[in-house]
Amino acid sequence: MQTRLEPITFITGNKKKLEEVQAIIPYVHAKSMELPEIQSLDMREVVAYKIKHALAQCNAPIIVEDTAVYMDCLKSQDGTPGLPGPFVKWFLETIGNRQLYEIACCFNNMRAYGKTVVGYAPDAYTILFFEGEVHGTIVEPTGEQGFGWDFVFKPDSCGVTLGSLPLEERIKCNQRGIAVQKLKEYLEKG
């Protein structure tokens, strides 16, 4: 079992994600590597696939995460969570935050939720999942603090967008902060 003094490698090239994780678990360090990212609506499947490929290049213990935003206006008729989901990175690269907001406006449905799945591999044979989910609304882009879709997402628990909050406040009310806090609590039990 991992103890809180043993370093954990967070597989990411995203410095902002690393800052959020290290604000909760300071003994995490990053390793940037190119990992194949399968196209799946199942976030646990995406995370497990990344972990499998990361473990081929570095030793456990490692963590990998995947984050999504689901817009109610783009959910399927059968109620399946809406787009962009885990494809949000490519949505933002293609259309940006302003257009994400405008899509919600066109449907007159601003409701959305953010979700993060953190996968923790304490060894080469085990993957544990920790999830965080935050409900809120898509709003006109504001803020200068966050990254990605933080500028258009206002959690129900906050009066402003995630992009308007400093790191210490953002991790208290975003989905990644919730998931990483669950991982921290698990590690500290050991």
Q: Where do the language-model regions lie?
A:
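Anionic-ligand binding patches
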Residues: Q2-T9, K16-G190
